[in-house]
């Protein structure tokens, strides 16, 4: 339901952030600070307060969004958006169960013979799925053209997954996924794993950061047919601000404290180290 006011002291405004837009209103004469606070009240934890952002409004004269002029105040119906600045800044990379979602990409039977260390990334991927269930983190799973390439491998337990969806696009970011994300409040971080690193993982990660999400790629749970393709994809993605990490690092960051009520269960998952394959020496 839109937050609207019927009296003449308020002006209707369409607030947009990332892929979301919401109708609301502000008092006549509202300026920069009021508008920023309104964005925070509407989108809450979806806005990473540590990032640099710019406020823009839609100019009818120019037919596009422009930066908010100095001294701007709302006097009539308008459209505003908050845009993360694409700068070479180092993300803090903090993970929290309340603001995270796991993406499992195309871990299908047909890829088993071709993908390097496929058995190892299945094992690590299953650890991540188990950890997500313990911590109550939503999981979405894609399958690339399952009619021809088969379903997700049986070793991966998809019990409780929020969404398992087919795709033909290499990126996981398709309308079905975006609709599912819109139903999960406060998502800020995506933990991404699967195949292939230089194709579907890379294109998914780039689409996600373009939409304002923080992306963590699990290096010991992603691979390709070619180790060279994998290596250069991870290097490129790291330069764009995407975090390259490991499964154990992700799970322990999510519990954060030995006193966390789920720590023992997570500890049981990582008690036996992840497979020491050739993947990590080729990151």
From Swiss-Prot:
Q: Which domain of life is it from?
A: Eukaryota
Q: Name one GO cellular component term.
A: cytoplasm
Q: Which PANTHER family match?
A: HYDROLASE, ISOCHORISMATASE DOMAIN-CONTAINING PROTEIN 1
The entry sums up its family as follows: Belongs to the isochorismatase family.
Please state what the protein is called: Isochorismatase domain-containing protein 1
User: What species is given as this protein's source?
Assistant: Danio rerio
